[in-house]
Amino acid sequence: MKTLSKILLTLSFVLSVTTSAFAVTVVSWGGAYTESQKLGYGDPIAKALGIEINWVDYSGGLSEIKAQKEAGAITWDIIDVFAMDTINGCDEGLFVEFDFDKDFPPAPDGTPASKDFFTSMPSKCAVGNILYSWNY
């Protein structure tokens, strides 16, 4: 539940617009994975904020992100990327760096974002929201 709260808090901040004319594009991996994101927090936050979320599937990597930046035509707002792509994209200036306590509001209980988010992730350009592991 804490992870879901973090995701919703992040999306609430990023999408803190009250006009229904606003839309955001979220890019993810497609299939059941994207559908779970859409149903779990995309649809609820879109309804709560009265906005539209456009979902786009991609196959990973940084090439499409680089092409958008080089063309000056960035159309993606939130991107689900692997940790290594986050590190490389941040180092290459493809992503925005966050100051977690300045750029994000505190949690409902007052906890600052730097203490509430997965800020130990390998980049200042990302808010970690998906954890997984392989068990052998």
Predicted regions and their residues:
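A generic local structural motif
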Residues: 11, 63-67, 121-123
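Short, structured coil segments at secondary-structure junctions
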Residues: 49, 93-94
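Early extracytoplasmic/lumenal segment of secretory-pathway proteins
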Residues: 24-88
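Sec/Tat signal peptide C-region and signal peptidase I cleavage site
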Residues: 17-23
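Bacterial N-terminal signal peptides
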Residues: 8-17
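A structural signal for short loop-to-beta-strand junctions that line the ligand-binding cleft
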Residues: 74-79, 96-101, 105-136
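Bacterial N-terminal signal peptides that target proteins for export
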Residues: 1-8
